Amino acid sequence: MHHLRRFIKPDSFLFDIGAGTGRYTSALMAEGYRVKAVELVRRNIDVFLKREPTADVVQGDARNMPFLPTGAADVTLLLGPLYHLIGDEEKLKALNEAKRVTKPGGLIFVAYLMNEYSILSYCFDEDRIEGLMERGAVDGDFHIQAQADELYDYVRIDDINRLDERAGLKRVTIFSPDGASDYMRTRLNRMSDETFARFIEYQKCISERADLIGAGSHVVDVVRA
């Protein structure tokens, strides 16, 4: 929410695409913003509406949203779907739809799962790297090669740059919302409230540093439609 607040205006209308159980939609509604949510999974919608019965949410696929008008949103959030869309072509379908439904010059927030976090925390830390490389799940450049039936796809900054170029999207900024936090979860849980508050302050301060963003578990690419 820290970075969202930097860019959204009080009268902004937002689409939350791939809203899940409505975490972001609920927070934005509580601050007075107008939000329409789209979510693929019916169960998530049910949980969402039980907690937020006045929410405007519709079931749909981020890659094809004919029920949303062209150029309607000041800001579009795409903070989940690209985790699960395997390969450039599927991701581009969602990016192009987000671009279509956003006003020309409006902003799109796009979240990605990062390759290096998974390589370090799963492949090496759990001693799986040799087996994964032997079967081609990780290539010689240590890039995870997700298959079409897998749940997650992982990217590097170069991949995001390529997608932006192909979709005709211009970057405003790119940031890591979590930084090193997923590497040090147990330590964070042991911190005093004062130290944890200082860590949050630190993460906000370094979240846009180009030398750090690719190592976190997620990044959010803020682009202009």
Where are the regions a protein language model picked out?
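A C-terminal cap/extension of S-adenosyl-L-methionine-dependent methyltransferases
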Residues: 173-225
